[in-house]
């Protein structure tokens, strides 16, 4: 970026300023002890010797305005040079002092390190109490101390005390004498109900069936007096009369007949 002095600006029409190229600013000579900055970090800026208030007294208002605008643009685009300090050598000495006493060092969190569990901590507390007592353990004092520290015991005592204080006096007094005579009927009835409850449920008998009504009268279809039946009368001369012979039947037919009659009745 190029920087121009006030003497290199010339006024043109309507007060506009035109930059006239001039010699570039010379960089500073490096100090003997300072390191040479890298090319990528060389943000140099030539200092301006003129202040915003200085200028030629015989300049016109338009030229003064253009010069002020030009100076503002040059001031906005200034560059800054950063002097990098030499890299400090690695110190092999002891680490710096610890922080203040208020900051406590963090304990190493190692999962392999054993920690005191509840039973071990309780045993250590018991050993410390025995050591403090000097070999003489006061059981009553220990119980009293434990009850005083126990949260559940304190809550239970508070509830009992609160319940006793909040109950009205009328509910705590006896209104009638309690009878010591055992009611026999009530005890027997209760025992009977318990026994009946243990019994399996009984099946209910089916309701009785209604007898069947009379059947339809078949005489309405015909007149009984006009009914005749014929029986054949066969006679054969010369043949002996027929003899009746009993035919044996199996014993199962009796039950079959009974079953058939029951089916007909149903």
Curated annotation (Swiss-Prot):
Subcellular location: Cytoplasm, Cytoskeleton, Microtubule organizing center, Centrosome; Cytoplasm, Cytoskeleton, Microtubule organizing center, Centrosome, Centriole
Pfam families listed in its UniProt record: PPP1R35_C (PF15503)
Positions with biased composition (Polar residues): 1-10
Pro residues composition-biased segments: 21-38, 86-97
InterPro entries in the cross-refs: PPP1R35 (IPR033590), PPP1R35_C (IPR029135)
Gene Ontology terms describing biological process: notochord morphogenesis; positive regulation of centriole elongation; positive regulation of cilium assembly
Keywords for this protein: Cytoplasm, Cytoskeleton, Phosphoprotein, Protein phosphatase inhibitor
Keyword Phosphoprotein appears in the UniProt entry: yes
Molecular-function GO term, any one: protein phosphatase inhibitor activity
Modified residues (Phosphoserine): 46, 51
KW ATP-binding (keyword) present: no
GO cellular component, one term: centriole
Biased composition (Basic residues): 62-79
Region Disordered, residue ranges: 1-118
Known role: During centriole duplication, plays a role in the centriole elongation by promoting the recruitment of the microtubule-binding elongation machinery through its interaction with RTTN, leading to the centriole to centrosome conversion. In addition may play a role in the primary cilia assembly.
Subunit structure: Interacts with PPP1CA; this interaction mediates the PPP1CA phosphatase activity inhibition. Interacts with RTTN; this interaction allows the mutual recruitment to the centriole.
Family classification: Belongs to the PPP1R35 family.
Name assigned to this protein: Protein phosphatase 1 regulatory subunit 35
Organism from which the protein derives: Bos taurus
């Amino acid at each position: 970026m190029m920087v121009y002095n006030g003497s290199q600006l010339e006024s043109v029409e309507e007060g506009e300023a035109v930059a006239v190229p001039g010699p570039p600013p010379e960089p500073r000579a490096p100090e003997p002890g300072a390191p040479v900055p890298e090319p990528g970090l060389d943000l140099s800026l030539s200092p301006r010797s003129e202040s915003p208030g200085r200028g030629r007294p015989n300049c016109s208002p338009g030229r003064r305005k253009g010069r002020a605008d030009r100076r503002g643009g040059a001031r906005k685009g200034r560059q800054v040079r950063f002097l990098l300090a030499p890299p400090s050598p690695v110190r092999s000495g002891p680490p710096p002092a610890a922080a203040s006493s208020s900051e406590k060092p963090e304990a190493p969190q190692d999962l392999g390190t054993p920690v005191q569990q509840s039973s071990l901590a309780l045993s250590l507390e018991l050993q410390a109490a025995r050591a403090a007592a000097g070999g003489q353990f006061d059981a009553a004092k220990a119980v009293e101390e434990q009850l005083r520290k126990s949260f559940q015991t304190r809550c239970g005592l508070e509830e009992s005390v609160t319940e006793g204080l909040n109950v009205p006096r009328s509910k705590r007094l006896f209104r009638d004498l309690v009878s010591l005579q055992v009611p026999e009927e009530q005890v027997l009835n209760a025992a009977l109900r318990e026994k009946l409850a243990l019994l399996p449920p009984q099946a209910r008998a089916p309701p009785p069936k209604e007898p069947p009504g009379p059947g339809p009268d078949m005489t309405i279809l015909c007149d009984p007096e006009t009914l005749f039946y014929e029986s054949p009368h066969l006679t054969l001369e010369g043949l002996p009369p027929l003899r009746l012979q009993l035919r044996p039947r199996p014993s199962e037919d009796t039950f079959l007949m009974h079953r058939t009659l029951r089916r007909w009745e149903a």
